[in-house]
Amino acid sequence: MPALNNSEAGTAEAEPLTRLPFEPITKSHILNCSYDNWHAKYRSSTLKSRIIPLTSEFLSYLREDGIVLPSEIATFPPPETYNNNSTSDGWDEDTDTGPDPSEKFSEIHKQIQETIAELDGSVVPKLNWSAPKDATWISLKQNSMECNTPNDIYLLLKSSDFITHDLEHAFDGCAEDPSITKESTQYVLVLRKWFKVNPSCEFRCFVRDRRIIGICQRDLNYFEFLFPLIPTLREVIQEYFDKTLKDTFPDRNFSFDVYLPDPFDKVRLVDINPWAPRTDPLLFSWLELLTLSVPSPLLGVADSSSVPPLPAQSSDEDEGTDDVEELGWMPEFRLIKKDDPEAYSFSSPQYSAHKMPQEVVEAGASGEGGMREFADNWQRMLNGELEMMGAGEDSDDDDDDDKTTR
């Protein structure tokens, strides 16, 4: 076979990428990253949590349009009257409560109540892969995922696009595998004990070929005090990875999130994420992470990157050592710098695209009457009377001039 001349070879190498060079993403990899599939193995370093397997009835409730909450004593007082000139309190006291949706999943409802009590009354919910971070706008806990009752949890889960993705699109973009389907997946509700998190202490780590190749902040704001701590943080995270995750997680490529509270000497494993475009690379790009040149290990399986090999070690002490690593190479540790554009552009609220349902936008655009009608319907929805969607015609407001067609 004739060899390519230099010009032909150069042309071949210069072909631009038309897509990110991911290996085929398998459904088994997605399942390996499901919380219930790794939590037991790494429980000693995770945050205190409980896992509740979900039934088809509960999943149907999450998938239903609209928001109907079970009857339950509210954990917050009703807001002040929306109309200061009104002689009534603005809330419907003569209600005809509809069927309680929790009757279809009474065992799950009871387990949630018991778990909240076990975890000191405050929890943070998530499903197999995602937490409803995009739905905190609807929470009455000031943009927090803290939940004190089952209804707090249901409201977040049913309002979240991230949760919908877990339920409907978990295996999008994966290679075909008839043995793994959405219907055969065991969905779970994870309830973590709530505590006040310092967002500056959360980090995302990217693993390729069982090696950390990059670490960065999860919260994209500038924290000056972190820069002198980079060597310590990198060492503590690397040591945790080498002892806990490196040889035990079933996939060689993945990312994981950790929390290192002050004094930054102990790692808490928060999550394990797929090595896939759906995972946010944050301060990196996926093209960087996929093509970054990394030295091949002296022993064991070589890294897939095409880089010159390191010279062989001549010391007799190196022979037979299984944990030999390259000297002088460390994973890159990225933080937001004071003058970075990200230090300012990311100071805006996260997940803003998910924060305002169309009904609220339309009610606000309709003026005072529209917002009054929406407030009535919202309170009735919290009382379990009606669905949030399509509730306008049931408003008890007698002033026809104030009604708005939507």
UniProtKB/Swiss-Prot annotation:
GO cellular-component term (any): cytoplasm
Keyword ATP-binding: yes
Region (Disordered) residue spans: 78-102, 303-323, 387-406
Any one GO molecular-function label of the UniProt entry: protein folding chaperone
Main subcellular location: cytoplasm
Biased amino acid composition, Acidic residues: 393-406
InterPro entries from the UniProt entry: CDC123
Subcellular location(s) of the protein: Cytoplasm
Keywords: ATP-binding, Chaperone, Cytoplasm, Magnesium, Metal-binding, Nucleotide-binding
Protein's UniProt keywords contain Transit peptide: no
PANTHER family, per database record: CELL DIVISION CYCLE PROTEIN 123 HOMOLOG, D123 PROTEIN
Biological role stated in the UniProt entry: ATP-dependent protein-folding chaperone for the eIF2 complex. Binds to the gamma subunit of the eIF2 complex which allows the subunit to assemble with the alpha and beta subunits.
Protein name per its UniProtKB record: Translation initiation factor eIF2 assembly protein
Gene name in the database record: cdc123
